[in-house]
């Protein structure tokens, strides 16, 4: 009798875990991420084609300078305040993969960052969803 109850209990726990994992997988919808295009406006200010980007842990984000190859920087205030495993990257193309743990306390987590071209800065954000 105890063996039967133990198997049933294990089955219940396994089913609950599978359902929870399924709900988590559905919560963060993966999309074919297009690169974020970085340009410079007539006023010299950096511009991006999306001011707010929603991503999942494990997604790869890529910024590309549109136009003549030009260096730009993606900067976060600190490594702890970055959804990536880096604080700053510079180049004509910048790529980062959203790290595990970027979602804090199981809640949607917003990260402000700077796009810097020369001395001009723009401050969009990345939102990481569970």
Annotate each PLM feature.
Residues 2-12:
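Bacterial N-terminal signal peptides that target proteins for export
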Residues 12-20:
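Bacterial N-terminal signal peptides
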Residues 28-60:
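N-terminal edge beta-strand
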Residues 63:
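Residue-level hotspots at or immediately adjacent to binding/recognition sites across diverse folds
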Residues 66-71:
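Short proline/glycine-enriched turn/loop motifs at strand-loop junctions of beta-rich domains
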Residues 74-90:
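Short, compositionally biased
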Residues 88-130:
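Extracellular/periplasmic metallocenter environments
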């Amino acid at each position: 009798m105890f063996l039967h109850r133990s198997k049933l209990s294990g089955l219940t726990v396994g089913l609950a875990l599978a359902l929870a994992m399924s709900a988590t997988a559905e919560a963060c919808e993966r999309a074919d991420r297009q690169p974020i295009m970085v340009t410079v406006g007539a006023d010299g200010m950096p511009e991006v084609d999306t001011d707010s980007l929603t991503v999942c842990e494990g997604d790869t984000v890529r910024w590309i300078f549109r136009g003549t190859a030009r260096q730009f920087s993606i900067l976060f205030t600190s490594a702890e305040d970055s959804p990536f495993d880096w604080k700053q990257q510079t180049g004509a193309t910048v790529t980062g993969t959203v790290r595990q743990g970027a979602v804090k306390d199981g809640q949607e987590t917003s990260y402000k960052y700077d796009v810097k071209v020369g001395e001009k800065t723009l401050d969009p954000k990345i939102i990481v969803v569970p």
